[in-house]
Amino acid sequence: MAADPSAVAARAQDAALVRACSFVHVQDRLPLCWPTPSGTPPSPKRAYRSHYVYLGCNDLQDRQSWQHLSDFDLVLRLIDFSGLRPVLAQRLGWTSGRGWKPFDPVSLFLLLGWQISSVWNRAQTLKNLDDPRYADYRQRFGFRQGVYPTEGGLRYFLTSLGHHSDSTGDAVRIELDNEPAVQVVIQYLNQLLVGAAQLIREAGLFSPEAWAQALVCPDGMLHDAASRLRCAAVKDSCYQPTSTQAPRPCPAKEKEQQGCDCDTLACADTCRYATPRDAEARFIHYSGSNQPRHSPNRAKDESKAKQGSGRKCYGYRSLPLLLADPVRRFHVTLLLDFQTANGREDVPAAALLWQLKPFYPDLHLDTVVGDAGFGFDVFLRTIYQLQARRVVDLRAHETDKDKSQWPLRGYDDRGRPLCPFGYAFTANGFDAQRQRYKWFCGKACQRGIEPVARLKGTTYPPAECAYQDAALPHGKILNVGERFLDGSRRLVRDVPVGSPAWKALYHRARNASEGRNATYEYWDLKRLSVYGLCRAKAFSFLADTWSTLTTLARLVREATFANTS
């Protein structure tokens, strides 16, 4: 059997991709113009201290010049960002042309993209902006020599973007079982991700299947805060003033730890062990495993797994919704949410799925893949309501360990239906129109197949089975839709767990998640360099936007230099 080619090699052999997306064929459509959402008002500012103008891509005619251009350099030449100006102005909360003369928000967007992709800190970026070696970048960003933003100006830019991302209060209502409904605020910085994804489509880089049969996967990522951990038990109350009349409660003492008495002047406004610059940061010990249940590296007994394993994080969690292109083997971030590290993932992930339709009206959702952390009812129900297939790893429960209960409830610990005598059903395909999976017993009891679970006091093979009649050639037929007959949906999946189809879908999604993880590792964004939830949120949205944009440039480069002979 021939080895599976790498993603780069596979794309180089994709004649349709090379024919449509190499520079020779795409140059007549350049520049790709940033799409401005309909209804977005123009920027109220009429003058700026800098001014971005698209400067063309004439140097790309020389193929030798490509060797010296990074993916970021190609982005500056392939895309006209003028349409982004009103979007950023709205996200910055600008409503009037009065007041100070700001820098062009597109200039700052490009400057921060330069910082992120070059893995520089803020001070180094501003220093390089004034360096004569980088005069061409300064010109393409739209800055005048000697007129640059300060570090404080960049901090203010990020703070404003993060604050106004959800300042409208628009929210998605998520219904929970046996709990009050939750309102998940919509992050309008997602307009940046939508614009970048639309540029990928305009360039013709997506395969037709990627959009018509969308495979999406949420995958939370922990980020250490810029502030260093002082107390793992810190809560909102630690940032409230204290007095002798109303002493501040100590969450650490509630956990029978030493804690802080908060009886000194240093603790008057805020506990001295808190982190005021990252007041929303929280501590979590992540002991879960991203390994699927069928992975050979997963521990057989989770209780015997190495003690103390896992990751400790004091900070935040980004939650992207990734679109994986299974044909051309790359991914983009469709939507993103950002929260504290200890926040639950299933509810905001469900909200992101509901937001796909308003942000991407023509995207056809086919399959949603996720690890066991998303295997809760609210997320599984949302996928079903959106008429997509559930390929979410199984979330274990104590009841799964008792095999004697499997025939009574009607399914095993992997969601495979069982007959009342403990024989496993055989999968017979997914009915997308009726949104249910069909199973049949195939008269396993008459074919010498061992039952998965034996019942005490029952003779095998059982003679009293009502489906052994010759008039029923397939035996008992069972259709499983949203739930099993006992009302549970925890183990209901629309692709048999562990089957080749399951593994193919799951691996595609995991590759997308690992690809984003590798990008964040390379850009050194696992520990945030900015303080506070607003700045951290804005920086994460910018990073995912630039990840998509540099992916566009990288794929155009590959198509341009592909040898399809």
Question: Residues of each region from the PLM?
Answer:
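Polybasic low-complexity intrinsically disordered regions
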Residues: 127-130, 156-367, 372-385
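Short, hydrophobic/amphipathic alpha-helical patches that form generic packing surfaces
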Residues: 107-119, 540-551
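Short, charged amphipathic recognition helices of the HTH superfamily
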Residues: 118-138, 514
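An internal, acidic/charged active-site-proximal segment
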Residues: 343-452
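Low-complexity, serine/threonine/proline-enriched polar segments
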Residues: 160-164, 242-291, 406-480
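Dynamic "connector" segments at or just before major functional cores
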Residues: 2-117, 134-140, 144-149, 156-201, ...
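Basic, amphipathic alpha-helical segments enriched in Lys/Arg and hydrophobic/aromatic residues
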Residues: 503-565
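Short amphipathic alpha-helical "interface-anchor" segments enriched in bulky aromatics
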Residues: 129, 404-441, 488-531
